[in-house]
Amino acid sequence: MAQANLSETLFKPSFKHRETSTLVRRTRHDQETQGLHSTLEGEKTSSWYRMINRLMWIWRGVNPWEIEDVLSRIAASQADRSNEQLLDTVIGYRGGNWIYEWAKQGADWQQRATESGDDAQTGQFWLNAANLYSIAAYPHIKGDELAEQAQTLANRAYEEAAKYLPYELKELTFPIAGGGTLTGFLHMPSQGKAPFPTVLMCGSLETLQSDYHRLFQDYFAPAGMAMLTIDVPSVGFSSRWKLTQDSSFLHQQVLRALPDVPWVDHCRVTAFGFRFGANIAVRLAYLESQRLRGVACLGPVVHHLLSDPNRQQQVPDMFMDVLASRLGMPFSTDASLKTELGRYSLKTQGLLGRRCPTPMLAGYWENDLLCPKEEASLIVNSSAQGKLMPVNFSPVYQNFDRALQQISRWLQDKVC
């Protein structure tokens, strides 16, 4: 896309779009969640609607100074906000608006990519743009038109990056029962020869496929494993489907289609679940044990948060809004949402607690509101070959890296 056209389409002020935090109408309880900090979600403070997820953004490759620069522009804006107490609620697509500022930053890197003459540098610049466009769309609330445009830009930039970086990216299309097709990205390492042992990625509810590039680049590819990503229901390429109690519906059909994908060794497939993605992955461990060599989870959300109203009351509004959006319940009462969430518990569904033949690893942090130790233990104790992996909180970045290294080795061991 030419820079002139990019500026015309991206940065023309518009005031017709609803502000992100107003898209889900629920009873707010921010006052009870101040100061919450989670390794995987980031920090919740009284000044922001969104969780500020510096660790994960830096891990994906965004420069820390760049993060602070964008956040400061948002914070300094004098424009009208839907909630004057929350800095990231500037109304309209203009300076100070969350989507506007992050997309503008992404466009800067896109421009650099088009001007660069070095392939490695060009690929990295496109990847930087994809990361920033994804943050612009975060937390990917259904019906957020500006966020959906940013998602499209993120996916385009991600595909452009792959043309220049030392791995192969294939866009795969899978037919879905009931109609429609689903697009997934197969990442293949530059070393080795297809068909590859493959990790099916089950991401968290507020991420895109492109957000897991670092996981492939630094962990799976060096181990000789491919990575297949699929958007969770109601996000990105999966936006036409809402999340149901059959949370693994889309991933299960993709898993069953892998024998027809020549680059994937369908006899050597594992799954990896982040947060709610673990709900999908563990469900697959039960329903498709003959197709999976192992399932690893990090900070899994499979029972306690879904079934405990008191725990839900402590969760930041943004996280509960994301859940309501994914379930297709943006206008529901808190009571009806919490009742529905209880049905997503894999223990309530009669799965967890039963013996599962699939090897499962579950990593957790102490005092994690979304995933207490009991959550991870429930998964591990249900597996015929379970492994519990505690992760120390500090130093945060090093321990996160160490956890991913352990998970990668464990998955590699299952497909060797």
Curated annotation (Swiss-Prot):
It is an enzyme of class 3 (hydrolase). Pfam families: FrsA-like. Its EC number is 3.1.1.1. Residues 19-39 are annotated as: Disordered. It catalyses: a carboxylic ester + H2O = an alcohol + a carboxylate + H(+). InterPro entries: AB_hydrolase_fold, FrsA, FrsA-like, FrsA_esterase. Keywords: Hydrolase, Serine esterase. One of its GO terms (molecular function) is carboxylesterase activity. It comes from the Bacteria. Belongs to the FrsA family. Catalyzes the hydrolysis of esters. This is Esterase FrsA. The gene is frsA.
